[in-house]
């Protein structure tokens, strides 16, 4: 399952593949989304050439709801270019601008301890600072621990400036399923080139068969 080498490189990729874990959890346990942790994002939205793709991460507690439509003025949203991060109540206030390579985002995945294959239980994601446009959420490290009968995987993202693509570099990776279409930007094309968003222009396509079947399209600057 080579696809999981990509899972945590970018937040959009994480949101897409989290849907597969949630579907697996529902099919195995009959349970829906886990309840959101305090201050965690409840959804991630990406606006791209196909419209808006939402990724619902967790259910808000009590009578609170998680907005899944593109709206910068709903009082529960942080907007960053073509991305929105949704919260059960208000988003973090007065976030400072991230410094280069500063910790910007932490993801926490809970699994049932000693399960094989691992049984996914819940997700939480926390924003620590405002990463400027032109910078990416980039994987820096991940840790694993066990506590109270649960395995916890924590993934750390830093705010890093996009590099310029080389001649043979992948500029975008596109994930497409029957329910979602997301683009993961890898680098910036030179000024006279563009990174295509049409899957038919891909130089390599991988078909992944899991609970959710989807294609991965690798794009190069043209």
Swiss-Prot record:
Annotated protein name in UniProt: U-scoloptoxin(11)-Sm5a
One GO molecular function term?
toxin activity
| Record's keyword terms, sorted | Disulfide bond, Secreted, Signal, Toxin
> In which tissues or organs does this protein occur?
Expressed by the venom gland.
Please state the protein's primary subcellular location. secreted
Modification(s) after translation: Contains 8 disulfide bonds.
Gene Ontology CC annotations of this record: extracellular region
What is the similarity comment for this entry?
A: Belongs to the scoloptoxin-11 family.
Q: Which organism is it from?
A: Scolopendra morsitans
The subcellular location is: Secreted
């Amino acid at each position: 399952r080579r696809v999981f080498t990509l899972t945590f490189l970018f937040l959009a990729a994480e949101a897409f593949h989290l849907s597969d874990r949630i579907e697996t959890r529902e099919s195995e346990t009959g349970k829906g989304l886990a309840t959101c942790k305090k201050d965690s994002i409840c959804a991630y939205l990406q606006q791209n050439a196909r419209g808006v793709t939402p990724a619902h991460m967790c259910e808000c507690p009590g009578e609170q709801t998680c907005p899944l439509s593109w709206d910068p003025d709903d009082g529960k949203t942080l907007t960053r270019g073509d991305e929105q991060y949704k919260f059960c109540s208000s988003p973090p206030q007065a976030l400072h601008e991230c410094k280069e390579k500063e910790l910007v985002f932490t993801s926490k995945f809970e699994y049932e301890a000693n399960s094989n294959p691992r049984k996914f239980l819940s997700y939480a994601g926390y924003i620590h600072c405002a990463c400027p446009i032109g910078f990416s959420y980039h994987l820096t490290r991940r840790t694993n621990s066990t506590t109270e009968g649960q395995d916890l995987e924590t993934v750390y993202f830093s705010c890093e400036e996009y590099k310029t693509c080389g001649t043979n570099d992948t500029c975008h990776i596109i994930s497409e399923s029957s329910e979602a279409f997301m683009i993961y930007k890898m680098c910036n094309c030179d000024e006279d080139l563009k990174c295509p968003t049409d899957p038919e222009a891909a130089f390599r396509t991988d078909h992944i068969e899991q609970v959710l079947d989807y294609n991965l399209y690798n794009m190069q600057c043209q």
